[in-house]
Design a protein with these regions (language model features):
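Metalloprotease/metallohydrolase-associated module, dominated by Zn2+-dependent proteases
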Residues: 194-266, 270-277, 281, 285-290, ...
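Second-shell loop/turn segments in exported
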Residues: 72-81, 149-161, 224-232, 279
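Acidic/polar, low-complexity intrinsically disordered N-terminal segments immediately downstream
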Residues: 5, 21-103, 107, 284, ...
Length: 323
């Protein structure tokens, strides 16, 4: 009898459970999507769509995506309050400078821009502690902006770093799509390329400001380069010449040329003779690459780089003063 009562009770319990399940409404949202936060479109999203994505074809990614940072970098999401400000600067001083009538013209960038732009709150030091202007693990079709959280359009040093990064990455994209004679360019300083920041970490150890880290550098000049990051590869060297030119005055570039050809001195005549030969070689490489890039930009982009330099620097300075 007890066994019958127990079986009856279990059967009744099962029926009640099935009835409850049939009355419960199913959630129309897929369980596959539950791991992802439901994102609502914001005013910032609409501004980005209208001012960056639609006119330039660039998708801006500012929400956290854990898989988009390179291994070993210290990155975190950007503060929302700075995103529009940094994108406005990129648009005005980077993209629109190229589109000026006296530079490349309205249609110059069509189909030639990165298709995705990632924003990060902090910097991008690599395994050697050297800050980078881009993410070397990404292709030239993808672009990154760092230090969004500390960006201030009225700070000349922060604006300098931003535009160095923007022009470096735009140059990388353009030389990817509009080919240059890499083999010929490589022969000029190919013996100096390191492929790593290990050898430049020590010379950069005392650099603190953006200008000190990314500006024209005497150590680099005396070895035939514009900047410290030029040592990494032919592509970096090429892009750095363009980027450094568009963010430096003609006098600053001229002074770098003088530095390249000025030998160090020593009390030992033999050492002095060696220094003189090193300076002669550095100057030769510096000016050959400078001429190579100027000719390439003129012939293939139909842009006078020196004229664009003056325009770019004036626009950057005016923008900083306005903010």
């Amino acid at each position: 009898m007890k066994i019958k009562i127990r079986k009856t009770a279990l059967l009744l319990f099962a029926v009640l459970c099935l009835t409850g399940c049939s009355e419960e409404k199913l959630n129309d949202r897929s369980v596959i999507d539950d791991s992802k936060q439901q994102i609502e479109t914001t005013q910032l999203d609409n501004w980005i769509l209208d001012n960056i994505t639609k006119p330039y074809g660039i998708e801006v990614v500012y929400r956290w995506e854990k898989n988009t940072g390179s291994t070993g970098t210290f990155i975190h999401p950007p503060k929302l309050k700075n995103i529009r400000a940094i994108l406005e600067a990129v648009r005005e001083l980077g993209l629109e400078t190229y589109r000026l009538k006296e530079v490349g013209g309205t249609d110059f960038l069509l189909g030639r821009l990165p298709i995705k732009l990632y924003l990060y709150g902090g910097g991008n030091p690599d395994e050697n502690g050297v800050e980078r202007l881009h993410n070397p693990q990404l292709t030239a079709a993808e672009m990154c902006l760092y230090n969004v959280n500390s960006f201030n359009p009225g700070d000349a040093d922060k604006m300098f770093v931003l535009m160095r990064s923007v022009h470096h990455q735009l140059a990388k994209r353009l030389i990817q799509l509009i080919a240059y004679d890499r083999d010929k360019f490589f022969t000029i300083s190919g013996h100096r390329y390191t492929g790593s920041t290990e050898s430049i970490a020590a010379p950069l150890g005392n650099a603190h400001t953006g200008k000190e880290k990314f500006g024209l550098d005497a150590y680099a000049n005396k070895r035939g380069f514009y900047t410290m990051l030029s040592f990494l590869s032919a592509e970096d060297d090429f892009a750095e010449i363009i980027s450094a030119t568009l963010t430096s005055t003609p006098k600053e570039v001229y002074d770098a040329t003088v530095t390249a050809k000025t030998p160090d001195t020593d009390v030992d005549p033999e050492v002095n003779a060696r220094y003189a030969k090193e300076a002669e070689q550095a100057y030769k490489e510096f000016t050959e690459k400078q001429a190579f890039v100027n000719e390439y930009v003129q012939k293939n982009w139909h842009i006078n780089l020196k004229q664009m330099q003056v325009i770019s620097v004036r626009r950057i300075n005016a923008y900083v003063k306005q903010h």
